[in-house]
């Protein structure tokens, strides 16, 4: 009888714990992450023992059909989340069990090589002067960011791989610029480095590649990053990081194009990297990005994408995404009022409304991202799992998996609050009905401004159109056919420098982003009408001069 009473009491207590836990989830506050509760070493890790034998957080192939995508994604995310919580809450691990779980959670890591030939597993980093550092942790001065020394990686077999990565491979608090580049991005990478020199960047730079950057390309990059060193145009502290050996050969080739950015962000030597696309152009000091309020509060810096109202989710896709969010964090996204009741951060709440109520697909612009890996590593690993999950085809590239990984991990994040903007040459719109200023900007460049209207950065390079679409556009776009004599003339125009005269932040509730159909569908137009819609920022003459200098440097022949 006593045994039955004890059992009854245990069941009741467990029920109370579950009720409290799920009530926390259902009143989700994205500013304060909720950690799942567990007690005891065995109780935490035993979750994995109850999984279907042979389970694996495998990569899904494009268009791979799965009968229950929501269930599959919830399981992917939950396995990573519980692993992270167990590491936080349990002292002393069964190392063999830990290793077995890691291999299944992160199959893209070459754990077999780590166990059988550790030296061959570790990555190689090459400095601009030819110095090669293998299996080493790099240390930089936290004040002037100069390289200090390297230390051999001392892998602690009593810790998980990712704990080792944070504590024995990565210098605590280190900051720097990370660029994912292969031979394909050579020219754009060089142009970005020239701009970084112009703005007098003093942070170290790592070019991360998956054995797809040739020695000749590295020599060219070094030349443009280091030659003619002056106070006004300082040489850059440049490093090349080859991560190929870290990857399971079965998965290495799956990291292509934009998905290579996950490798750069994850395996860079810096704990707090600022990730840039090769066609990103910063206009302020790198320190300015680290100082932005959103990063200071959350440890991540995300910028908004264009609000595109004509590229929408299918209702069936949103149904699955709602199931995933509810299954992972208990957030009900069925209507607008519930979203704003449950989510404290108004910027995040608006993004969720745009996605789940208005069906918009594009929310985050990943041309520049900062992520504190000490605070957000497992959210980022969740993002990687999502990138190769059944919902990958719902989204365009890597962009929105950055914030979705944070959301489904229930981690603290937000967006820079200023909407994305269009930058370029101001065109007067002739209207009999309008007496005030009426402007249009059409460009491929997506710009981002601070609260005071100052230009922070843009994505898309600094020529008219970087896409090789001039022949198609000349044949299919009447406007361009009328403007140019032939496709070769259009090609020259596309290669010419942009003119940065102003910025329009459109009022998307009245007049949003309009795709012109030009430049491989990357050209968008926005409107500003004084007193009616949009926000206009006109550059003053001194600012135009500075911007034109950056445009000239970026476009100079290589």
From Swiss-Prot:
Cytoplasmic side: 1-6
Residues bearing carbohydrate: 187
Biological-process GO terms, alphabetical: protein O-linked glycosylation
Transmembrane segments: 7-27
Enzyme class: transferase
Membrane topology: Single-pass type II membrane protein
Cross-referenced Pfam families: Mannosyl_trans3
Pathway assigned to this chain's UniProt record: Protein modification; protein glycosylation
A GO MF term: alpha-1,3-mannosyltransferase activity
Classification via InterPro entries: Alpha_mannosyltransferase, Nucleotide-diphossugar_trans
One Gene Ontology term, aspect cellular component: Golgi membrane
Principal location: Golgi
Keywords from the UniProt entry: Glycoprotein, Glycosyltransferase, Golgi apparatus, Membrane, Signal-anchor, Transferase, Transmembrane, Transmembrane helix
Compartment(s) where it occurs, according to its Swiss-Prot or TrEMBL record: Golgi apparatus membrane
Lumenal compartment spans: 28-558
EC number: 2.4.1.-
UniProt keyword Transmembrane helix, yes or no: yes
Purpose of the protein: Mannosyltransferase involved in adding the 4th and 5th mannose residues of O-linked glycans.
Other notes: Present with 1170 molecules/cell in log phase SD medium.
PANTHER family hit by this protein: ALPHA-1,3-MANNOSYLTRANSFERASE MNN1-RELATED
Family to which this protein belongs: Belongs to the MNN1/MNT family.
Name used for this protein in its record: Alpha-1,3-mannosyltransferase MNT2
